């Protein structure tokens, strides 16, 4: 599918997730693992890393596990629950191969959730935290805002939904408050932006945020 080709290009060709580390066993949290493309990449580069992946859609999580096995990317913990602000479950829209979201339309169902903050608080150091959770990133980051000091690198895929207020500045403020510098790349291309303020799409902006310490 097109989504996989895009994933592969971003991860293996553009190398958006590569980072430097001197640690023998870096810790990587992959929130929104999808079919496991990013984890295969992490395992290839950081052979001794401790990797924890989260994927809310149990069917996709099983595909992820199979892909990891087929690519010799083993010794990875995959948690098939949604990354959220509590452990009380959440309504989730399944979108097939593209994963799912708490926003938009799709096959709605209740899925199990975990509170990411609790995981972060139990880790003395995290080398890389990836958050690509299709629209839940603001709520999760807000809940984790006092638990980011032990993180060296953070990647966030920000999604702006037409029917909701934009939260990009709030996310950047959380990063600034926690001592991160950041770099942004927009994945949204609009011709004549002032003439295309309304959109039929449920999403009107998507930005990759790279947070790091120097």
Kindly label every feature range from the protein language model.
Residues 1-214:
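Phosphate/nucleotide-binding beta-alpha loop and adjacent structural elements of enzyme active sites
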């Amino acid at each position: 599918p097109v989504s996989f080709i895009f994933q592969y290009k971003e991860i293996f060709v553009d190398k958006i997730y590569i980072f430097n580390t001197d640690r023998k066993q870096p810790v990587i949290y992959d929130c929104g693992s999808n079919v496991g493309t990013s984890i295969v990449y992490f395992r290839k580069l950081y052979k001794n890393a401790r990797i924890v992946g989260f994927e809310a859609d149990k069917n996709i999580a099983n595909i992820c596990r199979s892909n990891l096995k087929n690519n010799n990317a083993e010794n990875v913990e995959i948690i098939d629950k949604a990354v959220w602000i509590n452990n009380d479950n959440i309504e989730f829209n399944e979108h097939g191969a593209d994963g799912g979201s708490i926003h938009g339309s799709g096959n709605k169902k209740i899925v199990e959730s975990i509170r990411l903050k609790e995981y972060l608080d139990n880790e003395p150091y995290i080398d890389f935290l990836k958050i690509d959770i299709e629209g839940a990133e603001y709520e999760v980051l807000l809940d984790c805002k006092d638990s980011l000091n032990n993180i060296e690198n953070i990647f966030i895929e920000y999604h702006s939904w037409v029917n909701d207020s934009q939260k990009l500045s709030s996310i950047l403020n959380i990063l600034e408050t926690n001592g991160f510098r950041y770099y942004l790349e927009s994945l949204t291309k609009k011709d004549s932006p002032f003439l295309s303020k309304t959109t039929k799409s449920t999403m009107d902006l998507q930005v990759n945020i790279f947070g790091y310490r120097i």
